[in-house]
Amino acid sequence: MLNSLIADFRIIFERDPAARNWLEVLFCYPGLQALLIHRFSHRLYTLGLPFFPRLMSHLARFFTGIEIHPGAQIGQGVFIDHGMGVVIGETAIVGDYSLIYQGVTLGGTGKESGKRHPTLGENVVVGAGAKVLGNIAIGDNVRIGAGSVVLRDVPADFTVVGVPGRMVHPSGERVNPLEHGKLPDSEGKVIRLLLERIELLEQQVATLQQQQSEQAWESDYRSCSETDREPVLCRLGDREIEEFLGGTL
């Protein structure tokens, strides 16, 4: 347990540029405080001691805003950044050196007993507000975008974004866990593709409109010449056609 506590302490300096000194980290980082209490409550929980592990968890939630069930298994070097609103269920497993942001839920999907919470591999990043629900497996080095909802297994090295979570194939480029701007934007990509398709369809429609307008002009011109209609009637027909097509002669 001591090694885990030391790793929890050191990882903050590696991942948070705002960490100035050990005194500030020890007293002003609720994520570290919640993990410190959890590691003691988890030890008591595994020994079968009733009541006190849950009481410690409750007090930790009161003081830090982070709720970790004493039964949850959390590896070393885990960093809960900001932390407010984080919920980690009883049977959840969090791998070494994972990064969890505020508002994250590692929860269940019902009232089933047994293993009912997710298992996170090593070096997993769970963005702010993300929900990982059910007895699912999240592979090593997975990145879960902010606000995503994950309900199925995710292989190692994949990125998950959106609601419901969609897996993005790994590009082979390894990025720093804190570089949120490099997360793929699948919704934005789809919107750009749809806009490009709309632009192409508009160009095709404009071409067809121009062709129809030219054909209608020639047809009206021949009709007027053959029947000796008054020019005003021909102009009226042209005006109606152009108003229908949305253009002007």
Curated annotation (Swiss-Prot):
- Family, per entry: Belongs to the transferase hexapeptide repeat family.
Gene Ontology terms describing biological process: cysteine biosynthetic process from serine
Q: Ribosomal protein: present as a keyword of the record?
A: no
EC number per UniProt:
2.3.1.30
Repeat listed as a keyword: yes
Recall the GO molecular function terms of this protein's record: serine O-acetyltransferase activity; structural constituent of carboxysome shell
Principal place of residence: cytoplasm
Q: Where in the cell is it found?
A: Cytoplasm
Record-given protein name: Serine acetyltransferase
Q: Which InterPro entries match?
A: Hexapep, Hexapep_transf_CS, LbH_SAT, Ser_AcTrfase_N_sf, Ser_O-AcTrfase, Serine_acetyltransferase, Trimer_LpxA-like_sf
Reactions accelerated catalytically: L-serine + acetyl-CoA = O-acetyl-L-serine + CoA
Record-linked Pfam families: Hexapep
Keyword tags:
Acyltransferase, Amino-acid biosynthesis, Cysteine biosynthesis, Cytoplasm, Repeat, Transferase
Q: Which GO terms describe its cellular component?
A: carboxysome; cytosol
